[in-house]
């Protein structure tokens, strides 16, 4: 074996010993690089005669081609080995049982809101909607809240650092009553000039915001307020609506209602509404579930209506609290933490 055959054998051995592309490139440099062994052979031809250069050059070029062929073959072998390793790592066992696709579900509070809308819808109530950033006027003034009322303070209400076009302060709505005001004013304007105004029956469900957070309060919570305005609407109608609603919502007739005198700036007289179950884990306990009352004449006037002619009642309840009562949940914050282990129980 001459020196060139020995060189080819050495290159083939080094290429075969390389187990990674980086090692193979290092081996290539030792034989085919600028300072490699083949390059050194070419440089050594300077002292040869023209005939010797011709013969020697042809032999060296043949040797270089054999080394390059060995290099290409090893590159392909390493690439194939890498591909096979990747395929093995990503192999899919088609005999394994399939994974069931996860099925989503409505949030329990969303279920409650839908249920509230369905029940009141069956009683002829419309559903109002409105902005979550409201003016101070719609949130407080229109509802007969005096300027010095504690609810207007930044300790209770989230104010936005800007005013509306009329210069009135803006805030995150602390209740959904502003939607009732907007609805009633639009209703009054739509039927202006008519001898008789069609009754206003509307509920206003949605998110509200207050500076409060504990096991039974959240800075963001849901509220549903209702309004029924007409010429002959009384507390008797309010009691009838509440009785039908709560018995339908909790799916039981074994339920009592109690109205306790209270105070709200926007109603007069006002009453808290309690319910008591005749059976079940809450049997015998009076539970506060809503506030209500006859709409204050000043509020009726702000609706754009004549309080001497039109009368009615308003009420407000917390869908979050109703959800807690319905499902036996003690901590309101669980509904808003996004823990699927908790929420998946309500599918």
Swiss-Prot record:
Domain of life the protein comes from: Bacteria
Cofactor or coenzyme needed: Mg(2+)
Main subcellular localisation: cytoplasm
Molecular function, one GO term: phenylalanine-tRNA ligase activity
Reactions that this protein is recorded to catalyse: tRNA(Phe) + L-phenylalanine + ATP = L-phenylalanyl-tRNA(Phe) + AMP + diphosphate + H(+)
The entry's keywords: Aminoacyl-tRNA synthetase, ATP-binding, Cytoplasm, Ligase, Magnesium, Metal-binding, Nucleotide-binding, Protein biosynthesis
PROSITE patterns: AA_TRNA_LIGASE_II
Name of the protein in its database record: Phenylalanine--tRNA ligase alpha subunit
Annotated organism of origin: Leptothrix cholodnii (strain ATCC 51168 / LMG 8142 / SP-6)
Gene field: pheS
